Swiss-Prot record:
Biological-process GO terms, alphabetical: regulation of DNA-templated transcription
Annotated Gene3D superfamilies: Met repressor-like
Superkingdom of source: Viruses
Protein name: Uncharacterized protein ORF60
Length: 60
């Protein structure tokens, strides 16, 4: 289930958003979701993957 989120944006950002949405035949909500998802995936991909440290007490 999707939750509703609202925010304020500058007029020039909305113009860019609408241009993108029209180009790819999306509505504003779909375009915003795609942009946020891409940004988050790209940013998280830059982070190193945590490595689990396993301790084996039977070797002590």
């Amino acid at each position: 289930m999707m939750k509703e989120v609202s925010f304020k944006a500058e007029e020039d950002l909305l113009v860019l958003l609408d241009r993108y949405a029209m180009k790819y035949k999306l509505n504003r909500s779909e375009a915003i979701r795609k942009a946020i998802e891409k940004m988050l995936r790209d940013e998280l991909a830059k982070e190193p993957t945590p490595v689990a440290r396993v301790e084996n007490s039977s070797l002590s």
